[in-house]
Amino acid sequence: MLTFWLAVATLSALALVAGAVLGFAARRFQVKTDPVAERIDALLPQSQCAQCGYPGCRPYAEAVAGGAPINKCVPGGEAVMLKIAAQLSVDPQPMDGEASSRPESRVAWIDEGNCIGCTKCIQACPVDAIVGATRAVHTVVSDLCTGCDLCVAPCPTNCIEMRPLAITPTSWKWDLRTIPITVIQQEQHV
């Protein structure tokens, strides 16, 4: 019985020392982050698509906090740019040429007859929208795909292409400014 309590005491002391060392290390080597970059990063869509010219959303947020243009986020579009402008109290900028000229709703499509199951597209996809296994046919989950094109280049058989998103009631972009509205005045009944 003495051996049992000795083992418990030894493990408890070891856990206490390890906890103290880890607590000290966490405070001593703490990485300080920019709170402005944190707020901007929270506004970005987190697709990590690199269409802005930065390797991901966090580096772009840090660059914007440092003064980079706020109009480079293609997946977020004008809505994200306006939120960033409001957050930083700066004037909104027109969308970048590449961001505005690109079709808004595109998804990757895999020709399953030519897919060899190499998994290079799965490794390139930043949002895990491609499913499949090694030497098996892959397919794209269109609800998750952001249309970033990063899966197209690594494909050795060129079986991936970007196609327009099929228009459904949930994906339709309603432009309420083009709907004619007629104001009907009701007659007063006494």
UniProtKB/Swiss-Prot annotation:
It is found in: Cell inner membrane. Residues 1-26 are annotated as: Hydrophobic. The keyword Repeat applies. Its EC number is 7.-.-.-. Residues 32-90 form the 4Fe-4S domain. The complex is composed of six subunits: RnfA, RnfB, RnfC, RnfD, RnfE and RnfG. Belongs to the 4Fe4S bacterial-type ferredoxin family. RnfB subfamily. This is Ion-translocating oxidoreductase complex subunit B. It comes from Sodalis glossinidius (strain morsitans).
